[in-house]
Amino acid sequence: MANFTSEEAVRLKFRIEESDGATTALIEANIAHAHQGIVSRIRPECIEAPPDAVIIGETLLAGAATLRSLGARLALDRRETRLAGHQIETGRRFPALIETAAAAEAEGARLIAPYERYTAESEPVALLTEAH
């Protein structure tokens, strides 16, 4: 089954370039993971003809996972960096990326929620969750 979103859509939405360290393989893996999580939760009719909100939700969830991956790498890097069109200071890179990822993840889950099956698990759609 084909993913609902694409690498191009994730890169465009989050303004992520190849030079940011986000490889095609990384983004495609995050898209596949987001897709698997969404398909396991939404109603069958939404799988065959996904509403725009589900497509955008998948883009946001895949982008959030990509930002978290980049954030983990950048947390170890001491250089100044420019990511998603913003200059990020050395001490703020990791928190800024994680904050952006969390907001995207929450919005993606909110967009997908109306299309979930009534029997969907109560766990969040989030690809990565913070420890509680």
Label the predicted regions.
Residues 65-132:
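Short loop/turn elements at secondary-structure junctions
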Residues 1-55, 103-132:
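Conserved short "hinge" loops at termini or chain/domain junctions
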